[in-house]
Amino acid sequence: MSQLLVAVSSPWASDKLAEPIADFAKRLDASVFVAHVATLQETDEHESDATQRGEQTLQLFTDRLKAAGVEAEGIMLFSDDTAKAILNTARARNCSLIVLGLTGKGVLKRLIAGDVPTNIIRSSEIPVLLCPANWDGTI
């Protein structure tokens, strides 16, 4: 059985990506690891908020995949390097594909926060599927 790693950063992902990812996973007869990375650089006050939001996002996404009949597991990661955490997890779990939902960040935000998809693509030997923010979910 193939394994997919779907990296999510917000509840938007569960609304937008869960159904098409479930369809895709079924076509591939794949299980899905849903990963969220909480950064360690956040202040204590925001870190707990970020962790709670991440756990909620994971729960929403995995519940929707399971409801669609897909084997799914949520993984909460803590790292100051989001791309590296996603890649290391995909490698450790022997994933055959990494799926990323693009947020539609502008150039300035990517320069400040870093461009996780670009860093993953440059460093990954595992294929990466990018889902644009304005994607309608059609596969």
PLM regions: where:
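Short secondary-structure boundary segments
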Residues: 36-37, 101-103, 132-133
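Intrinsically disordered or low-complexity boundary/linker segments at protein termini
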Residues: 1-16, 123-139
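Glycine-rich, Arg-bearing micro-motifs that act as flexible, cationic patches
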Residues: 101-123, 136-139
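Structural beta-alpha unit
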Residues: 66-98, 137-139
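General small-molecule cofactor/ligand-binding pocket signal
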Residues: 33-35, 73-77, 129
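Small/aliphatic-rich secondary-structure junction motif
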Residues: 2-51, 64, 68-70
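Short, hinge-like loop/turn segments at secondary-structure boundaries
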Residues: 49-53, 91-93, 116-117
